Amino acid sequence: VDGTCLRVPFPEGEEEEGERYRCSIRQGAYKAFERNGLVFAYMGPPEQEPPFPEWEGNFTVAETDELVPYSNFQHCNWLQVQDNAADNFHTMALHAKRQVTGEKFQGTTFDEVGAASMEVPPDMHFVPVQGGRSLACSGARRSDDGHMYIRVQHQVLPNLSLHAYTSEDGHKKKLFGRFNIIRWTVPVDDHHSKMLGWRVLGPGIDTRGVGDKNLVGYETMDFLEGQVALRRPQRFGQYKLEDMPPIPSDHRAREHYKDAQYAPGDYEAIISQRQIAVHALENPTKFDAGVFMFRKLLRDAVRGTNPNASPEKFAEWLREEGAAPNSYCSGNVFELPVGRTKEEEVTLRRHLAREVVKILSAAETVKGAQREAFVRERMEALQAEVLERRAA
């Protein structure tokens, strides 16, 4: 990883000269290191190397949990893959049981994994945070008559997304649940990319015990079917988890292409936009604001009009944060009854979506257990304030 020459051929008896020669040469190399099954490389000027961001110090992994690496290939450019993560509203359409044609269910919907709350259309609130370096995507949805679920996804420039618990049913109070997926969207070329990252698995985050380590790895992901070109019957029908099966040349070359159209997953939704989506053909609603806000943050960073997101300022910020910046990523279930009127319910959803982000912003100056206690205390106060106002 540092270009060191490991050995040179030399005749017996000339070992000393061979060793001197070996130590005198070095191949050009990029600095690389391994972390929990993933290899990271720094490819910029050595004198400008930023610290590796250990989000929250340990990626919020509980002692009972672990980081499980995965690599998922995508037949399109990286930006529209990242768009999918910023589009927090899409779960109610793409991943809803009612969208599957002819009841040909294949595991692509949240209802099939007992997390129907994710199929409820949320009220969305998008806020650029951390000096314009990232975006907090706060969605408020009613999970049952006694609970309101606020899920905050964190999109970090240029290609990182931090996802809260993906199997939340929203039927039990939970404040400040943390990372369930950590994902970097990495370009391969203009027309292909990879999703590389970790799935956090264990009883700390997976309170419903539905995660499956045996389905996380190369060209496979456990939380919903349809994340990669190969569906599970093809991925595991002939291959083991540790194998590296061939990837189809394109999405239409798959033998199960037609079957996948009955129950499309994220892969189908992303890839079917072309290898490079034409933005001029889009028909956005207000709930797509997160996609457009993230694109603008990225565009401004590239153009230099978002100076905080420049490589130099980003590195400076990471050093100031001790290479362990805080994240807005969180899953929160409040014990709050349904509004007495539709207007009251809508007002409540929007209020909670905004206030949760404000609480997380107020906690940016503290770290670790102190921050966790601060956030939970403020969220308890938020719930009490809503209930008190309801009783007045």
Labelled PLM ranges:
Residues 31, 40, 45-392:
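C-terminal catalytic domain of Rieske-type non-heme iron oxygenases
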